[in-house]
Swiss-Prot record:
Its cofactor is Fe cation. Fe cation binds at H361, H366, H541, H545, I663. Pathway: Lipid metabolism; hydroperoxy eicosatetraenoic acid biosynthesis. The gene is ALOX15. It holds the Pfam family PLAT. The lineage of its organism: Eukaryota, Metazoa, Chordata, Craniata, Vertebrata. This is Polyunsaturated fatty acid lipoxygenase ALOX15. One of its GO terms (molecular function) is iron ion binding. InterPro entries: LipOase (IPR000907), LipOase_C (IPR013819), LipOase_C_sf (IPR036226), LipOase_CS (IPR020834), LipOase_Fe_BS (IPR020833), LipOase_mml (IPR001885), PLAT/LH2_dom (IPR001024), PLAT/LH2_dom_sf (IPR036392). Keywords: Calcium, Cell membrane, Cytoplasm, Dioxygenase, Fatty acid metabolism, Iron, Lipid droplet, Lipid metabolism, Lipid-binding, Membrane, Metal-binding, Oxidoreductase. It is an enzyme of class 1 (oxidoreductase). The PLAT domain can bind calcium ions; this promotes association with membranes. It is found in: Cytoplasm, Cytosol; Cell membrane; Lipid droplet.
Length: 663
């Protein structure tokens, strides 16, 4: 009993306010009090009022709210509700919401302290947890876009998504406006150049968007250089393929007269400076047919050497795997005629485009993040500390992935229109790539060690990924230590165990065979797993997303398709190169989509900078503050390093890393 001060915060996005009336109740350990009709929430506003409660409530557990309407349901986006009392000396309790309130049902918001099942011995929150998860499992159902692929949220369109997973209006308007602009520019360029005959590589300037990326302009000017070709395996938009050679690849057969090359490769191998990029995953993938014209896919192997100055230079390129009973395929060398060597590198870059966009970016970034998001919503109630830790890193992931499945990789989507693996090959590639989703490959300390990239001073991706992983790991450990005092408390958390199992066994289709845990047996194992989840949704995605505009804007550096088969001889002319690279329309659409998806997003939340406060109490806030301080220190270190580099690496710079897979 006594006077309570109540504050209610409404979101700032368009349509966040409501004309409907909201009714509130306070629920404590010893009683419940109705506060009456008190407010019509206004967008971006915080409403405060005081109310005298006659009942003795004890410690507050919930705020219940109900929105009532007479004519139409006007959804309300509630940020949080704060209650202080009884009296001026009473405690303040924060009740996080950060969701849409629709209909006229009663919504219960638990106080913001993170609590596991073990933390609730009296069962004060037991019913709420069970009812919330039961409702969530109806809303968040597993779906299967294509047989053989990891699972996704059920639903074919954005309207099938739970409302809380959809873009807020400001994000939706920006995304759709950029798409409209890109398609309009594409239509204009198509109409102006429909009869244009492409004769030289400089003709690609006609569809190149100057002023969008300084780095892209440098790529256009330097893309033919071997040093830049090798650099992209270390620090480009797909740093996930390169590995240090421990033996010469079995597929590397030497045609007659290649003894000197073999000796050079053996020498680099013995010195530990031989690296390889193997695209065997593309072997046998069905190539697209675009407007009745056959396209082509290759499965190259690139052998590279790391020089003392840190440059990674190509030594040989094999464009296709050898076949039993046939002569070894040709090996293309830097000493070949310039056009021959350039075309071989273009084939590698086109193959890298396919593996990057489908395997490294879509599958390992977007789709795995979606598995984490769906499992989190199905298994962890909003009061659970791991839900509170993870939820800022899952924002918008389900909608952006549905947009990808209905626009990019759908039937008649962008891949079918202009990409050589479209028309079904892209689905086959995703199915194959699932076998390579190993747990260790999602954890940079393990992945970089496995690929032999630790200690490579010119691999700025490796350096920044390790730093970011360590910072995330300390952040996760800080939160975990507040809520799990022993390994036994981890093992006894049935919600946590169900979440882990849902990710590994259900969403990832039995990934325990690939090293993913089915149960979490210790605090250390929990920290490692949660760090992996957050890194996947932040740094891992950003490292394969942010570079698209820089490296794919100049189409010859990353051709979306190839219109002639890979060369089998070395008599290559400029005419053959131009006939192989994408035509005008294909190149224009690649440029348009690259701009839309690769541009710096005007509406984004940088890593760790989310405004939502899901935790109550000073301890979690102190952990988050420390996390932000460490991110700021990393930001400064990267800034200082990049100032000394000819080609700055920024794709893991914390201010550019998005807090979730949202684009």
């Amino acid at each position: 009993m006594g006077l309570y001060r109540v504050r209610v915060s409404t979101g700032s996005s368009f349509c966040a306010g409501s004309n409907n009336q909201v009714h509130l109740w306070l629920v404590g350990e010893h009683g419940e009090a109705a506060l009456g009709w008190r407010l019509r929430p206004a967008r971006g506003k915080e409403v405060e009022f005081q109310v005298d409660v006659s009942e003795y409530l004890g410690r507050l557990l919930f705020v219940k709210l109900r929105k009532r309407h007479l004519l139409s349901d006007d959804a309300w986006f509630c940020n949080w509700i704060s209650v202080q009392g009884p009296g001026a000396s009473g405690n303040e309790f924060r009740f996080p919401c950060y969701r849409w309130v629709e209909g006229d049902g009663i919504l219960s918001l638990p106080e913001g302290t993170g609590r596991t099942v073990v933390d609730d011995p009296q069962g004060l929150f037991k019913k709420h947890r069970e009812e919330e998860l039961a409702e969530r499992r109806k809303l968040y159902r597993w779906g299967n876009w294509k047989d053989g692929l990891i699972l996704n949220i059920a639903g074919a369109t954005i309207n099938d998504l739970p409302v809380d997973e959809r873009f807020l209006e400001d994000k939706r308007i920006d995304f759709e406006a950029s798409l409209t602009k890109g398609l309009a520019d594409l239509a204009i360029k198509d109409s102006l150049n429909i009869l244009t005959c492409w004769k030289s590589l400089d003709d690609f300037n006609r569809i190149f968007w100057c002023g969008q990326s300084k780095l892209a302009e440098r790529v256009r000017d330097s893309w033919k250089e071997d040093a830049l070709f090798g650099y992209q395996f270390l620090n480009g938009t797909n740093p996930m393929l390169l590995r240090r050679s421990v033996r010469l690849p079995a597929r590397l057969e030497f045609p007659p007269g290649m003894g000197e090359l073999q000796a050079e490769l053996e020498k680099e191998l013995q010195q530990g400076t031989l690296f390889e990029a193997d695209f065997s995953l593309l072997d046998g993938i069905k190539a697209n047919v675009i407007l009745c014209t056959q396209q082509y896919v290759a499965a190259p192997l690139v052998m590279l050497k790391l020089q003392p100055d840190g440059k990674l230079l190509p030594m040989a390129i094999q464009l296709q795997l050898p076949h039993k009973g046939s002569p070894p395929p040709p090996l293309f060398l830097p000493t070949d005629p310039p056009m021959t060597w350039l075309l071989a590198k273009c084939w590698v870059r086109s193959s890298d485009f396919q593996l990057h966009e489908l395997h490294s970016h879509l599958l390992r970034g977007h789709l795995v993040a979606e598995v984490i998001a769906v499992a989190t919503m199905r298994c962890l109630p909003s009061i659970h500390p791991m839900f509170k830790l993870l939820i800022p890193h899952l924002r918008y992931t389900m909608e952006i992935n549905i947009r990808a499945r209905t626009g990019l990789v759908s039937d008649s989507g962008v891949f079918d229109q202009v990409v050589s693996t479209g028309g079904g090959g892209h689905v086959e590639l995703l199915q194959r790539a699932g076998a390579f989703l190993t747990y260790s490959s999602f954890c940079p300390p393990d992945d970089l060690a496995d690929r032999g990239l630790l200690g490579v001073k010119s691999s700025f991706y490796a350096q920044d990924a390790l730093r970011l992983w360590e910072i995330l790991s300390r952040y996760v450990e800080g939160i975990v230590s507040l809520h799990y005092k022993t390994d036994e408390s981890v093992r006894d958390d049935i919600e946590l165990q169900a979440w882990c199992r849902d990710i590994t066994e259900i969403g990832l289709l039995g990934a325990q065979d690939r090293g993913f845990p089915v149960t979490l047996q210790s605090k250390d194992q929990l920290c490692h797993f949660v760090t992996m989840c957050i890194f996947t949704c932040t740094g891992q995605h950003s490292s394969t997303h942010l570079g698209q505009l820089d490296w794919y804007s100049w189409v010859p550096n990353a051709p979306c398709t190839m219109r002639l088969p890979p060369p089998t001889t070395k008599d290559v002319t400029l005419e053959k190169v131009m006939a192989t690279l994408p035509n005008f329309h294909q190149a224009s659409l690649q440029m348009s989509i690259t701009w839309q998806l690769g541009r710096r997003q005007p509406i984004m939340v940088a890593l760790g900078q989310h405004e939502e406060e899901y935790f109550s109490g000073p301890e979690p806030k102190a952990v988050l503050k420390k996390f932000r301080e460490e991110l700021a220190a990393l930001e400064k270190d990267i800034e200082i390093r990049n100032a000394q580099l000819d080609w700055p690496y920024e794709y893991l710079r914390p201010s550019l890393v998005e807090n979730s897979v949202a684009i």
